[in-house]
A protein has these predicted regions:
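Conserved active-site segments centered on acidic
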Residues: 1-77, 145-146
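Phosphate-binding/catalytic loops
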Residues: 94-146
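Receiver (REC) domain switch/active-site residues of two-component response regulators
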Residues: 84
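Short glycine-rich anion-binding loops that position phosphate/pyrophosphate groups of nucleotides
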Residues: 10-12, 91-94
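Hydrophobic alpha-helical segments
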Residues: 22-25, 53, 90, 98, ...
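Active-site loop/turn elements of alpha/beta-hydrolase fold enzymes
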Residues: 40, 91, 114
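A short, aliphatic-rich alpha-helical micro-motif
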Residues: 80-81
Length: 146
């Protein structure tokens, strides 16, 4: 099974939203692929679940989150060898954190441009995030099976 890891700073907003959208869309088309998510600087967010505005948008999309009650996870707590693709949500924000984490130096990380609140409103970032995830799933469908 193909596995994707979405990464943001705190693992409560963009990466969690992307994980839930990806898994919903992949299940819908019977794609043998699943996503998970983690944060680069989880810190005190380890006691937080998915951000309420992300939950609200998922509800509007009729997506029932599978991990809505689970707490944030730091990227260092995962076996990164399990993932075929690692995507950081915002290059400008996340690349310095990736560079500071020696565990991540040898990984091939894809960077998106989904900017966090308050820099960009959720009315812009969440639809953009959905579109990027949907495009990723559609690309996976078209990719030849190995």
């Amino acid at each position: 099974m193909h596995k994707v890891l979405f990464v943001c700073t705190a693992n409560i907003y963009r990466s969690r939203f992307s994980e839930e959208v990806y898994n919903y869309l992949a299940r819908k088309v019977l794609l043998s692929s699943r996503a998970f998510s983690a944060g680069l600087m989880v810190g005190h967010y380890k006691t937080r679940t998915i951000y309420a505005p992300a939950m609200e948008y998922l509800n509007r999309l009729n997506i029932i989150p599978r991990r809505k009650d689970e707490l944030s996870i730091h990227i260092n707590d995962l076996d990164l060898d399990e993932y075929d693709k690692i995507i950081c949500m915002d290059k400008n924000e996340n690349e310095p954190m990736v560079s500071a984490n020696k565990r991540l130096h040898c990984l091939n990380i894809e960077y998106w441009d989904i900017i966090d609140e308050p820099m960009v409103s959720r009315q812009i970032s969440l639809p953009k995030c959905y579109e990027r995830v949907e495009n990723l799933v559609n690309h996976q469908i078209k990719e030849p099976k190995h």
